[in-house]
Every structure is written in structure tokens, then in C-alpha cells.
Amino acid sequence: MWLLNDLFASTPVHSGERLSVVAMQQLGEIGARAKDLFERNRKLLNEFLDTREELEAVRPEFGTVMFPRVRSGDSEELCRVLREKYETSVVPGKFFEMPAHFRVGIAGETAVLEEGLERLGKALDEISRG
């Protein structure tokens, strides 16, 4: 009896190739969904930034990440509080030789970003209280 592994072991990317064909056939729909998602999430993050005086950011029109700066000068404490107390991850700016910044992505589902921004707000409030 043949196993799927016997059939696909010599070409392990077969399933990936099949999925890529399906995706290419629906590229317009996929692109439209992605554009809508990025625009909605970018607007959400920009609105959040408008309410947070302790952050500033260049607000690009395109892309899937933003790189806000913590005005106090160090994002390390913010990243630690987010990770330890709120189980939320952002990428510390130290990895980009910009320790006052942190990287946040907007390519995920909007509900996840909303929850993440709520947690980010709580962490910022906690840090500002001392």
C-alpha cells in the first residue's frame, strides 16, 4: 500500500506548489483583502498614536510595520512589561540600533491588533505611573 509520503517524498514542495496555483488564481481577491486589512489596521494604529503623548512615529502610507519612538528614550522597560504582564510582543528597537523605538506589525487580524493596542496602552499607563 502506498503512503502519501511515498508519493511526495521526492518532491516535498508538491503541496506548496498546489497551494500557490490556487493562490495565483485568486490573486486579485487576496490582494484586495490584504489592502483593506492594511488600511484598516494602519488607521487603527494611527488613531491609537494620536492618543498617546508618550509616543511619536513617522507614519508611512504603505508597509506592514511601524516603528514608534518612546519619548522618554528607552523602549526596553515597555517591551519587558508588555511581555511579562500582558503576554504581548513588540520588537525592541535595540535590535535595530535604535533603543528608544519598538517595532509593531499591522499585518494580522484587526481584532488581534485592537487587543494588542489595548495592552500597549495599559503598559504605557503603568510605566508612566512609575
Task: Mark where each language-model region is.
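Conserved core segment of the aminotransferase class I/II
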Residues: M1-E39, F48
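Alpha-helical elements of Rossmann-like donor-binding domains used by nucleotide-donor carbohydrate transfer enzymes
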Residues: L3, R18-V22, L37, L44, ...
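Conserved glycine-rich beta-strand-loop-beta hairpin in the small C-terminal domain of fold type I
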Residues: E17, V21, L37-N46, A57-R69, ...
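Residue-level recognition of strand-loop junctions within catalytic nucleotide-signaling folds
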Residues: Q25, R71, A107-E109
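Preference for bulky hydrophobic residues occupying beta-strand positions
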Residues: L49, P68, V104-I106
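Surface-exposed helix-capping loop/turn segments at secondary-structure junctions
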Residues: D50-V58, S128-G130
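PLP-dependent enzyme catalytic core of the Aspartate aminotransferase-like
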Residues: E77-V90, F96-G130
